[in-house]
Amino acid sequence: MSALRLIVGLGNPGQEHAQTRHNAGFRFVDSLIERSGARWALDSKLFGETAKVDIAGQPVWLLKPATFMNLSGKSITAALRFWKIEPEHLLVAHDELDLAPGTARLKFDGGHGGQNGLRDTIGLLGHGKFHRLRVGIGHPGHKDRVVPWVLGRAGREDDAAIGTAIDAAIDVLPLAMEGHFSEAMKRLHTSRDA
């Protein structure tokens, strides 16, 4: 695997969405910003906020699309074109209904699994050959409750578990940055914290 050059967190912009389950991807990249001391800057040509940080001595761009979840691909593809980055150097962090809170999983390639930000990105790229960080938010139990679930806030216990999973993912990120994605996956997937 090639080293990562762009990490995108999916979510919805605006204070009213800031603490929702759907914004787990935003939460991941915000945690990277907090650890690095960098700051977000609005970049209208990329339809989102951007920052450049170093992880394991490697420079990497961070992106938070301001397009709302369902149109995330517009921002992601603009950034890939502008920075001349191939999709295999991309990691997209997003919420995952099919994983329990406290669980995070890395993967490469695949479909969208019903996640609309991934659906839009895959549709615009024409393929799913990029890396993903799936941050578990749990499932409400019935498909009719999914929309209010993802747009709602997690309870205290689930919120803490999501934070722990994000921390575990950040801990293995240096391996992924160096091109050791399989090793990063192995460590994250066998971690007791994720």
UniProtKB/Swiss-Prot annotation:
<dbReference type="GO" id="GO:0000049">
    <property type="term" value="F:tRNA binding"/>
</dbReference>
<keyword id="KW-0378">Hydrolase</keyword>
<dbReference type="GO" id="GO:0006515">
    <property type="term" value="P:protein quality control for misfolded or incompletely synthesized proteins"/>
</dbReference>
<feature type="site" description="Discriminates between blocked and unblocked aminoacyl-tRNA">
    <location>
        <position position="12"/>
    </location>
</feature>
<dbReference type="InterPro" id="IPR018171">
    <property type="entry name" value="Pept_tRNA_hydro_CS"/>
</dbReference>
<protein>
    <recommendedName>
        <fullName>Peptidyl-tRNA hydrolase</fullName>
        <ecNumber>3.1.1.29</ecNumber>
    </recommendedName>
</protein>
<feature type="site" description="Stabilizes the basic form of H active site to accept a proton">
    <location>
        <position position="95"/>
    </location>
</feature>
<dbReference type="Pfam" id="PF01195">
    <property type="entry name" value="Pept_tRNA_hydro"/>
</dbReference>
<feature type="binding site">
    <location>
        <position position="17"/>
    </location>
    <ligand>
        <name>tRNA</name>
    </ligand>
</feature>
<comment type="similarity">
    <text>Belongs to the PTH family.</text>
</comment>
<feature type="binding site">
    <location>
        <position position="116"/>
    </location>
    <ligand>
        <name>tRNA</name>
    </ligand>
</feature>
<dbReference type="GO" id="GO:0005737">
    <property type="term" value="C:cytoplasm"/>
</dbReference>
<feature type="binding site">
    <location>
        <position position="70"/>
    </location>
    <ligand>
        <name>tRNA</name>
    </ligand>
</feature>
<keyword id="KW-0820">tRNA-binding</keyword>
<comment type="function">
    <text>Hydrolyzes ribosome-free peptidyl-tRNAs (with 1 or more amino acids incorporated), which drop off the ribosome during protein synthesis, or as a result of ribosome stalling.</text>
</comment>
<comment type="subunit">
    <text>Monomer.</text>
</comment>
<feature type="active site" description="Proton acceptor">
    <location>
        <position position="22"/>
    </location>
</feature>
<feature type="binding site">
    <location>
        <position position="68"/>
    </location>
    <ligand>
        <name>tRNA</name>
    </ligand>
</feature>
<dbReference type="InterPro" id="IPR001328">
    <property type="entry name" value="Pept_tRNA_hydro"/>
</dbReference>
<keyword id="KW-0963">Cytoplasm</keyword>
<comment type="function">
    <text>Catalyzes the release of premature peptidyl moieties from peptidyl-tRNA molecules trapped in stalled 50S ribosomal subunits, and thus maintains levels of free tRNAs and 50S ribosomes.</text>
</comment>
<dbReference type="InterPro" id="IPR036416">
    <property type="entry name" value="Pept_tRNA_hydro_sf"/>
</dbReference>
<dbReference type="GO" id="GO:0004045">
    <property type="term" value="F:peptidyl-tRNA hydrolase activity"/>
</dbReference>
<keyword id="KW-0694">RNA-binding</keyword>
<dbReference type="GO" id="GO:0072344">
    <property type="term" value="P:rescue of stalled ribosome"/>
</dbReference>
